Each structure stands twice: as C-alpha cells, then as structure tokens.
C-alpha cells in the first residue's frame, strides 16, 4: 500500500540550542489532570466490559468529565472538607448490544472511584467527593466500525502531533513531578500532595523550576515541619535534575507562601488537591498526550483522555505520532529533533492518513537522504500496525496525560 508520507528537512535551530524554552507539567492531582485521569479510567473500564461481554470494543466517548471545586478548611495536623468536590462523568456509551443490556454507568462509577482511591489516597470518597454519572446512549449501529475485521474509519477530519526526543528541560520537568510522588512521598515525606505543578524555564544554560505542591495537613505537624519539608523537597529536586542535565538548575517550591510577620499563608490542603478549595477541572485543559505542555514545540490542542481508542483520531493520532517520533529518533541516526503530524480524513481508513508529515532537524553534516528513507520505513510500519495503539491503550501501556 502506498501512503502519503512526507519527510522534510526542517531548517530550524534544535530545541537544545534555542535561547529560551518553556515546559509545564500538571501533576496527577491537579484538577485538570484528575478530570483527564477519570475520563481515561472510565473509557478503559468500558473497553474491558465491552470486550468481556460482546467480544469487541463498542462505541463510547467519555472525554467531557467536569470537576466543580469544593470548599475546605486545611490546618496543620488535619483539617476538613466543608463542601465536597462534585465530579460529573459525562459522555456517550453503548448500553445495549444485540438485545443485551450493558451497565455502562455502573462500570463508569466503579472505575472512577477506584481511580480516585488509587491516585489521591487522602481523599475520603464518603465525605470529600461526590461522583455523578450522566452517560448518553451511543449507537450500536456503529458496531461495524468497531470490529477487528478491518481497519476502522476515521471519525473526523483532525490531526495528531508528536515530537522526540524530550529535551533536557522536558525530562527534568516530567520526572520532577513523577519522582516527588512515586519516590520521595512514599519513602520520606508523606505530606507531599498529588496536586503538583512544575513550570520550567531555560534561558541558555540556566534552568529555573517553579513548583506548586499542595501539602497534606494531616502529615504536616506545624510551620517548622512545613518549611523543613519544602527544603528537603528542594534538595531532592536539584539532585534529581543532575540525572538529566549538566546545566545550572534552581528551584522554588510554593513561591507564594508568606510566613514572615506572623502571616501563615501556605499551600496546605486536606486531601492533596486544590480541587477541594476553589480550583475546577476539565478534560483536555492540562498536559498533552506526552504528559507535558510544551509551547516551544508543535502541539495539538485536542483532548486525548476518554476518547474511544478505536477510531477517534483525537486520541489515536496524538498517541501514534508520539510513538512514531520516538521510534524515528531511536532507529535513525543523526536526528536532533523530529516533529510528526498526522492528518486524517473523515470516513477514510485510519491507516491511510491524508498526510503523515515528519519534519526532521538533522545533526550537522548528516546524510539527509538516509534519514529520509529510514524515517519513512518507521512511519509506514506504524501505520501498517496502527491497531497496536488500541491494544496498548486498553492494556494501560500508554498514558494520555
């Protein structure tokens, strides 16, 4: 099959040589990320339910989850949620197939509660959060689109974008949030909340990190304990950064804190997320499908979480383009940066995009003809096996935010 694959030489300064770079990550406890996580958890649970009962994934989209912030009174040693967070699971799902009813809303609620329990352990689901579900009915007439007997047809004319490799700053920002939660919180500072936002700025060879972290009051005894925890976190972040860069790195945690003159104004929470006290959340307002917000790179603004993994281009092409970019960098020598853009055409097979564009910034002196031919092979192979993305999503092997 001949596909429209374009590999072009991009005459642009590689990201590592640009003077200024910005990168952001909203952690898993940020209200927008909670919305993303819930939407994807529900979609994944529905996929498994459909496969178990119907033998195939049926039509659904759960990418409209909304979080309405609650109200809380955090304090050292405890605190309480005064008004619970309200979460609404919204979308479409197939609830009947060949005369069999499918408990889609029950599955969605169970998946959402399990996700919150596993992601924000300080959240008391009996008191701190209300989870509601309003799924509309998807059409079972779409089942022909959702079979494994042929390549699905694109549900829309849309595009996906990915890039590789991660720059040093992108690695620092991504892993700062991940390691604070998966390592430092578990081993030493349980007071670290899941609502962590990391903003990274690189100016030439100087990197500055601004980190906001909602600390969990029940694990923080007093102001001295809070300040000491921040100091330990700062040291940890600076040490972690040396694994990814030799550049000079500085870090500030909870820069808005005011502790002088008797003003104890700090980022303290009851549950570990600012959703408890004023911050709402929506799907698609946070990280892109690679886990970052990268204004120095090409990006798609479309949400990935919660969309069906069969034929929804907003999900498949964003995830696929990132995998393609990473494999091009891994398999092809002398590539500094690569940007992948995939454009679908509604009603056409998803393995035949209107264009698969790879813009490559080669290393100095590279043989671009060789890069071009090798990149085409990588891209074409992924398109030939595009349904692998669906399998990876259902198995939980790909993150969407």
From Swiss-Prot:
<dbReference type="GO" id="GO:0005524">
    <property type="term" value="F:ATP binding"/>
</dbReference>
<comment type="similarity">
    <text>Belongs to the AdoMet synthase 2 family.</text>
</comment>
<dbReference type="InterPro" id="IPR027790">
    <property type="entry name" value="AdoMet_synthase_2_family"/>
</dbReference>
<dbReference type="GO" id="GO:0006556">
    <property type="term" value="P:S-adenosylmethionine biosynthetic process"/>
</dbReference>
<keyword id="KW-0547">Nucleotide-binding</keyword>
<dbReference type="Pfam" id="PF01941">
    <property type="entry name" value="AdoMet_Synthase"/>
</dbReference>
<dbReference type="InterPro" id="IPR042544">
    <property type="entry name" value="AdoMet_synthase_3"/>
</dbReference>
<dbReference type="GO" id="GO:0004478">
    <property type="term" value="F:methionine adenosyltransferase activity"/>
</dbReference>
<keyword id="KW-0460">Magnesium</keyword>
<comment type="function">
    <text>Catalyzes the formation of S-adenosylmethionine from methionine and ATP.</text>
</comment>
<dbReference type="InterPro" id="IPR002795">
    <property type="entry name" value="S-AdoMet_synthetase_arc"/>
</dbReference>
<keyword id="KW-0554">One-carbon metabolism</keyword>
<dbReference type="GO" id="GO:0000287">
    <property type="term" value="F:magnesium ion binding"/>
</dbReference>
<keyword id="KW-0808">Transferase</keyword>
<feature type="region of interest" description="Disordered">
    <location>
        <begin position="278"/>
        <end position="305"/>
    </location>
</feature>
<comment type="pathway">
    <text>Amino-acid biosynthesis; S-adenosyl-L-methionine biosynthesis; S-adenosyl-L-methionine from L-methionine: step 1/1.</text>
</comment>
<protein>
    <recommendedName>
        <fullName>S-adenosylmethionine synthase</fullName>
        <ecNumber>2.5.1.6</ecNumber>
    </recommendedName>
</protein>
<dbReference type="GO" id="GO:0006730">
    <property type="term" value="P:one-carbon metabolic process"/>
</dbReference>
<feature type="binding site">
    <location>
        <begin position="136"/>
        <end position="141"/>
    </location>
    <ligand>
        <name>ATP</name>
    </ligand>
</feature>
<keyword id="KW-0067">ATP-binding</keyword>
């Amino acid at each position: 099959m001949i596909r429209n694959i374009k590999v072009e030489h991009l005459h642009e300064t590689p990201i590592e040589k640009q003077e200024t770079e910005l990168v952001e990550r909203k952690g898993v406890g940020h209200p927008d990320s909670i919305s993303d996580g819930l939407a994807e958890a529900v979609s994944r649970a529905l996929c498994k339910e459909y496969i178990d009962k119907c033998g195939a994934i049926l039509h659904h989209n759960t990418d409209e989850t909304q979080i309405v912030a609650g109200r809380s009174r955090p304090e050292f040693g405890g605190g309480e949620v005064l008004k619970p967070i309200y979460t609404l699971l919204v979308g479409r799902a197939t609830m009947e197939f060949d005369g069999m009813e499918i408990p889609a809303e029950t599955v969605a609620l169970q998946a959402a509660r399990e996700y919150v329990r596993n992601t924000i352990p300080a959240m008391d689901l009996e008191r701190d959060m209300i989870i509601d579900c309003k799924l509309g009915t998807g059409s079972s007439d779409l089942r022909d689109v959702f079979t494994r007997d042929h390549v699905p047809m694109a549900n829309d004319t849309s595009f996906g974008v990915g890039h590789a490799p991660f720059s040093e700053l992108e690695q620092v920002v991504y892993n700062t949030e991940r390691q604070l939660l998966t390592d430092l919180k578990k081993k030493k500072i349980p007071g670290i909340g899941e609502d962590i936002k990391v903003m990274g700025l690189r100016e030439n060879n100087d990197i500055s990190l601004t980190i906001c972290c909602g600390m969990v009051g029940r694990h923080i005894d007093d102001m001295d304990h809070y300040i000491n925890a921040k100091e330990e976190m700062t040291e940890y972040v600076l040490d972690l950064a040396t694994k990814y860069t030799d550049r000079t790195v500085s870090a500030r945690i909870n820069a808005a804190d005011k502790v002088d003159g008797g003003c104890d104004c700090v980022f303290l929470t009851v549950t570990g997320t600012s959703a408890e006290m004023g911050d709402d959340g929506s799907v698609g307002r946070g990280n892109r499908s690679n886990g970052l917000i990268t204004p120095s790179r090409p990006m798609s603004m479309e949400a990935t979480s919660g969309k069906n993994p069969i034929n929804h281009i907003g999900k498949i092409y964003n995830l696929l383009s990132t995998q393609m970019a990473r494999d091009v960098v891994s398999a092809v020598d002398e590539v500094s940066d690569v940007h992948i853009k995939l454009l679908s055409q509604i009603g056409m097979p998803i393995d035949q995009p209107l264009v698969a564009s790879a813009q490559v910034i080669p290393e100095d002196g590279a043989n671009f003809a060789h890069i071009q031919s090798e990149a085409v092979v990588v891209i074409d192979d992924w398109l030939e096996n595009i349904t692998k993305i669906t399998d990876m999503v259902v198995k939980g092997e790909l993150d969407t935010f």
